[in-house]
Design a protein with these regions (language model features):
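Hydrophobic, well-ordered secondary-structure elements that form the walls
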Residues: 348, 422, 480
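Intrinsically disordered, low-complexity regions
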Residues: 44, 71, 303, 308-309, ...
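DNA-contacting surface of Y-family translesion DNA polymerases
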Residues: 9, 230, 238-417, 437
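Gly/Gly-Pro- and Ser/Thr-rich, intrinsically disordered tail segments characteristic of DNA damage-repair
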Residues: 1-293, 444, 449-508
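Generic "edge-of-domain/loop-turn" microfeature
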Residues: 40, 154, 188, 311, ...
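C-terminal hydrophobic structural anchor segments
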Residues: 405, 409-468, 473-474
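Short, internal active-site loops enriched in acidic
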Residues: 150-152, 185-190, 350-357, 425-431, ...
Length: 508
């Protein structure tokens, strides 16, 4: 008989914002702080918002201008409630703001420091290791972990709730950062307990929330929960398809899955809508999750592609973007060398900027297809293309030539560009690549001696380039990514130098 499992999920509360508060010796629960890079303009996305600032209706992933707007609205209300309509001072502390209505709401904008957050995350993981072995912990993200605690409850003579609280209190005592936890009989339920149920319970004095779910309590509490997008893996696309058939909750999905074959609502409908993904959706609707911690640890992903992308800080023209694409291709080639991989297919996607259609002169010139972005704005349809190489390679020169040929072919020279994505497909281990020369069709009209000499020259060139790539990688690993740069990295509009100093696209 299979052992009953117990899992704990822990999410550090507003992690980046909490770290910035602790670095300033401030209380993360009462300090109004947002982590964002103001140098990227007010359109930049906030990486984190402190709990006290979220109380003003600011979402966790707001854009900076939304924070400015919400704070302005809050201050207008505060000002109207003052007899003489004048503030006596400012404060970014929610406790002071709550006791003194004459203070103007203020907040701290903290530029992101990704290396610092990684350091805190490592320290917190070390705390978890005091209680749970690494093979029973899955690091889901920099601020979230899953744990299989089944074998630890008897050892510690604790309930899952007590063990979760013990670890959270240890983290709080050591770092000053609080957390939310979910406990469940499978990985999905502990995640949902943390993401949905815990958000609707009162925190303790330290801001800690802990919620528990099993299959039956999940159905009782959450089968009627809306919106359905609150559930893990259910995005707007899923929700829209379900809504077209009058399915708005997980309970609706569960009931649909047990419909008879001659009825409209049955599992065939779900498979028609979502294909093989319907299986997991149905499992989750019932509170089932077949995946275990052992399976996560045993999983070895098969690398079939690698992708690099960036959103430019401002609209770039054709030539400046071409420079950035060259930089990205150069770095992708080094990444392939570092991983011992080769490719023979490159995919390039270029996203155009909204200014192409908001500027009257540009809009008048553009005659191509128009689409709508995720914010409902009209933009020119993106450029997308694929190019196949003659051989599998990680050569910078061969990849650069191919990508530049593709870029020049698919990109509209008159449009401003905002997004770039490059993907290397059909990856293979460089040591297992077959020798293409083995099955060559011969003819009487080819000078094979000249062909042989040409190939020998090409191989010698590739060999020299490979040694140079390996030398560059060695220097970069030892002295930093910016220890060695190319001339193009210093040209106007180049982004590689700045991006080399970032983690996850943000300041380190």
């Amino acid at each position: 008989m299979e052992e009953n499992k117990t899992y704990i999920a822990i999410d550090l509360k507003s992690f980046y914002a909490s770290v910035e508060c602790r670095e300033r010796n401030r209380d993360p629960l009462t300090t109004n702080l947002v982590v964002a890079d103001p140098s990227r303009t007010e359109k930049t996305i906030c990486l984190a918002v402190s709990p006290s600032l979220k109380a003003y209706g600011i979402p966790g992933r707001a854009r900076l201008f939304e924070v400015v707007q919400k704070v302005r609205e809050a201050n207008n209300i505060r000002r109207r409630n003052i007899p003489d309509h004048h503030f006596t001072g400012t404060s970014d502390d929610s406790t002071k703001l709550g006791t003194d209505p004459t203070l103007q709401l203020d907040y701290i904008i903290a530029p992101p420091r990704m290396a610092l957050y990684m350091e805190y995350s490592t320290r917190i993981y070390d705390i978890y290791l005091k209680y749970i072995a690494p093979e029973d912990i899955h690091i889901y993200s920099v601020d979230e972990v899953f744990m299989d605690v089944t074998g630890y409850l008897n050892t510690y003579h604790m309930t899952a709730r007590e063990l979760a609280m013990t670890m959270i209190q240890d983290v709080l005592k050591t770092t000053g950062i609080t957390a939310t936890a979910g406990i469940g009989t499978n990985l999905y339920l502990c995640k949902i307990a943390m993401d949905i149920v815990a958000k609707h319970i009162e925190p303790d004095k330290d801001g800690v929330r802990i919620a528990e779910l099993d299959e039956m309590s999940y159905r009782r509490k959450l089968w009627s929960h809306k919106p359905i997008t609150d559930f893990w893996r259910v995005g707007q696309g899923y929700a829209k398809k379900l809504a077209e058939y009058g399915l708005y909750t997980m309970g609706d999905v569960a009931r649909c899955s047990v419909g008879k074959t001659n009825e409209l609502y049955n599992e065939d409908l779900l498979y028609k809508l979502f294909g093989i993904n319907a299986e997991l959706l149905i499992d989750h609707a019932w509170g089932y999750e077949p995946c275990t911690m052992d399976q996560i640890k045993a999983y070895k992903p098969e690398t079939n592609s690698i992708c690099t992308g960036q959103v430019l800080h401002c609209p770039y023209d054709f030539d400046k973007t071409r420079l950035v694409v060259k930089e990205m291709t150069d770095l992708m080639a080094l990444d392939l060398v570092d991983k011992g991989l080769v490719t023979d297919q490159i995919v390039l996607t270029i996203g155009y900027d909204i200014d192409n259609l908001t500027d009257s002169a540009r809009k008048k010139r553009y005659k191509g297809a128009v689409t709508t972005d995720r914010y409902g704005r009209k933009v020119p349809k993106h450029a997308h293309g694929t190019i196949n190489l003659k051989r599998q390679t990680s050569s910078t020169q061969m990849l650069m030539d191919a990508v530049m040929e593709l870029y020049d072919r698919i990109v509209d020279k008159d449009l401003l560009i905002r997004r770039i994505n490059i993907t290397a497909n059909k990856l293979a281990d460089e040591h297992t690549v077959a020798n293409d020369d083995a099955y060559e069709q011969l003819d009487f009209f080819t000078d094979y001696e000249a062909v042989k000499k040409q190939r020998e020259k090409e191989e010698a060139d590739l060999d020299r380039e490979r040694h140079m790539q390996e030398a560059m990688l060695s220097i970069k690993k030892k002295y930093g990514k910016n220890a060695i740069l190319k001339g193009m990295n210093l040209q106007e509009g180049a982004t590689a130098k700045d991006r080399n100093a970032q983690i996850g696209g943000h300041k380190a």
